[in-house]
Amino acid sequence: MGINRRQFLQNSSAFLSACAMGTGLSAVSEALQAQANKSRIELLGSYWTFSGSAIPHSDREYSSFDFRDRVEAMAKRGFTGMGIWHADLAHILETRSLKEMKQILDDNGIRHVELEFINDWFVEGEARVQSDKTRALLLEAAETLSARHIKVGDFEGKTTPMPVLIESFAKLCADAANAGTRVVFELMPISMINTLADTLTMLEGANAANGGMILDTWHVFKIGIPFAEIARIPLRFLLGVELNDGYLKAPEGMTIQEETTGHRQFCGEGEFDLKGFLAALARTGYDGPYGIEILNLNLRAWPLDRAVEHAYTTTLAQFSG
């Protein structure tokens, strides 16, 4: 992909400034390379980061910000991807069609669409009935919106035999393939699969070309996955990445559910070694977009533009130095 006019001017300015200050050519070259690397990073605004006053796991999960406003604000700042939660999608569809949503996304250059979240896709009974409704909604949307992937997982640690998980995941991937999209399993410390090894076992067993995992740094650091293990993840299974920061150890009295839904932090503002994580990730060959998923009680009151600006700049800063 060729460099665009803006990047050319930025690089030229950086070169001239460095020369004026007497900086050595090798240092100038390194600075320009770092700037070029940052220009290739694609950021995806995960749903909860820009959902306004929406509250996870409640009956008010839809965003307080209009869909078009979110798309335009993210695109203006440089995002090329956007996440949409199932309850928010249903809310949007009360006033807009999927075709209209697609047009808004296309008009603003948002080419990476993430849909979430399917829970209980591996169980039976009433929970599965509700899960299948979400599944149908997201699959229909994925086809029209040309979604990059659909996120799935488990929030309740519902212990399930591996053969059942493999069969269920394979079927989910088959349904997604018919809709032209992929399925990414989000590994969490609170899910029925909470180790990288078991995640890979499920993915290998399902053996679906469109099935893989998404790594969220909050879950990676809470589980304690070594960077060496991350570096060895087969690229064919690594279909998505989400970045955020947080506490290595939760404050006393705070549950993991409270922490993950209300106390995540922007990149560089917590205790995670994000640059170490990114270095390990680079060894896998991952070159897809990076989601930014911040669930924070204070963030719910922020204006949209402030949230977009802060999320973008703090995340991009992790790719330098």
Place the predicted regions along the sequence by residue.
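N-terminal pre-domain/capping segments
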Residues: 2-143, 177, 208-212, 235-238, ...
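Acidic/histidine-rich catalytic cores of soluble enzymes
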Residues: 81-82, 171-271, 278
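Acidic-and-aromatic substrate-binding clefts and catalytic sites of carbohydrate-active enzymes
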Residues: 62, 85-97, 120-131, 155-163, ...
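Active-site groove signature of glycoside hydrolases
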Residues: 142-160, 179, 185-188
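Active-site clefts of carbohydrate-active enzymes
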Residues: 253, 263-265, 288, 292-298
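Charged helix-capping and loop-helix junction motifs
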Residues: 96-100, 128-136, 162-170, 197-200, ...
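A cross-domain feature marking catalytic cores of carbohydrate-active enzymes
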Residues: 45-49, 84-88, 114-119, 152-154, ...
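Residues at the N-termini of beta-strands
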Residues: 81, 149, 240, 288-289
